């Protein structure tokens, strides 16, 4: 590998603002912000959605019992398609 062409890999703190959770993850993301966590200063990045706040992972997912668009089309216009012209 060529020296000095790869981004610096380091531990970064990601802050899920909607769940107010902090994650320490190895990353090459560039950021100017820093945060002190557990007595150590880390690069800091805010995110809006993570596994702690996304409905799929939290189990608070909304389910919709709507029929699909193809079924709605058949319901509205099914008679026109099958009707004989004449």
Swiss-Prot record:
GO CC annotation terms, alphabetical: ribonucleoprotein complex; ribosome
Entries under Gene3D superfamilies matching the protein: Ribosomal protein L31
Keyword field: Ribonucleoprotein, Ribosomal protein
Segments passing through the bilayer: none
GO BP, sorted A to Z: translation
InterPro entries: Ribosomal_bL28/bL31-like_sf, Ribosomal_bL31, Ribosomal_bL31_B, Ribosomal_bL31_sf
GO molecular function: structural constituent of ribosome
HAMAP family, sorted: Ribosomal_bL31_2
Family: Belongs to the bacterial ribosomal protein bL31 family. Type B subfamily.
Quaternary structure and interacting proteins, as annotated: Part of the 50S ribosomal subunit.
Name under which the protein is recorded: Large ribosomal subunit protein bL31B
């Amino acid at each position: 590998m060529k020296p000095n062409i790869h981004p610096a890999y380091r531990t970064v703190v990601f802050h899920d603002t909607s769940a107010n959770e902090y994650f320490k993850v190895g990353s090459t993301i560039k950021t100017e912000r820093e945060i002190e966590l557990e007595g150590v200063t880390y690069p800091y990045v805010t995110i809006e959605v993570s596994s702690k706040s996304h409905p799929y992972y939290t189990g608070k997912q909304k389910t919709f019992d709507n029929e699909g668009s193809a079924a709605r089309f058949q319901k509205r216009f099914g008679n026109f398609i099958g009707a004989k012209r004449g």
